[in-house]
From Swiss-Prot:
Belongs to the SHE3 family. Residues 343-352 have a biased composition (Basic residues). Its main location: endoplasmic reticulum. Residues 279-358 are annotated as: Disordered. Keywords: Coiled coil, Endoplasmic reticulum, Membrane, mRNA transport, RNA-binding, Transport. It is found in: Endoplasmic reticulum membrane. The lineage of its organism: Eukaryota, Fungi, Dikarya, Ascomycota, Saccharomycotina. Disulfide bonds: none annotated. Pfam families: SHE3 (PF17078). This is SWI5-dependent HO expression protein 3. It is a peripheral membrane protein. RNA-binding protein that binds specific mRNAs including the ASH1 mRNA, coding for a repressor of the HO endonuclease. Part of the mRNA localization machinery that restricts accumulation of certain proteins to the bud and in the daughter cell. Required for the delivery of cortical endoplasmic reticulum into the emerging bud. Residues 39-118, 181-215 form a coiled coil. It comes from Candida glabrata (strain ATCC 2001 / BCRC 20586 / JCM 3761 / NBRC 0622 / NRRL Y-65 / CBS 138).
Amino acid sequence: MSLENAVRVVSTDEKGNQASSTKLIELLHSRVDALTTTNIELTTKLQELLGNLDTVQQRERKLKESAASLRHEGDNVTLMLNRKERKLTEVKEAIVELTTKLGEAKEVNHSLKQKFEDEGLTSEESLRESISEVKTEYDTLVKSHEIYESSNDIQCKSLEDRFSQALLIHGENMKALDGTAEQILANNSELVSQLRATENKAESARTSIRNASIDTAAKVDLEKWLFLYKEAQRICEEFASKTDTKLPDELQAIIDDPVLKELDARFALDEIQYGKTRNKRIPSNPLLSNSQAAARRVASPSANYSPRVSSAQGSLPGITRTPSMKVNNKFSDSNAQEVPTRLHSHGSRSKRSSMVFK
């Protein structure tokens, strides 16, 4: 009995008799219970079937993998067989070629044996004839060699005679050259003496020019001018750093002048040399005056300048300083590019010129 039929029965029973509704409900409950039990049984069967399906699928996968591996192995085996077959065919072809070559070689050997047997007697006669021809050719070569050797001896004798004549001519020429060489040496000595005289004159002119340049440098007193320049440079740089301003291009160009930098470096080098020679020759004196220390600070451009200037430092160019500094430098003729520092005393005053001219 289906559910629709039950509903129809219910509808008919409601019209006819409502008392049988309870029975119908109980009947429906029993039907529902039966359907649930059947549903549960079907679900359990379905789960079992699904599990069986999974196992079957796994087995199928394994079988497919094994089949693929077997196919791969079969392909490899077929490839190996094909290679072996190719090799066998190649070997068979090589055997056929070798058999044909062997047959040809046998035929050639047989023909050569026949030729050797036929021409064995004639070959000895031909060899004897060729040997006799070689002997006659050798005899002719020996005779031609003897003739050539005799002609060479005659030519060598004529060459020896010519060589002896050339030696005699060479000796006469050497005697003439010796006379001209003595004359050239005499002329060379005269030229050397004249050259030495001109060198002495040039050296005297260089020394006079050097002394004049040193005198002018001492009169100008470049050390004080350099000190004033360094002091002005320091003040300008200090002013620019304090006011956080940039110096004009013209002033910066004057500060970066390579000539002034070269003078500064040379004064520093002279001061170092002066300190070394003074430390070697003069013992340290604790009673050194402040004026001499100030003079050394003025001469050294690398010293730290202070705004307070001593009386010796603040004097204008042309005014002499009280300390007297001597620098002993030797002048070498081989290095004529640098002129050493000299000391020129004018009366009771002494000045030190540390200018290096090129």
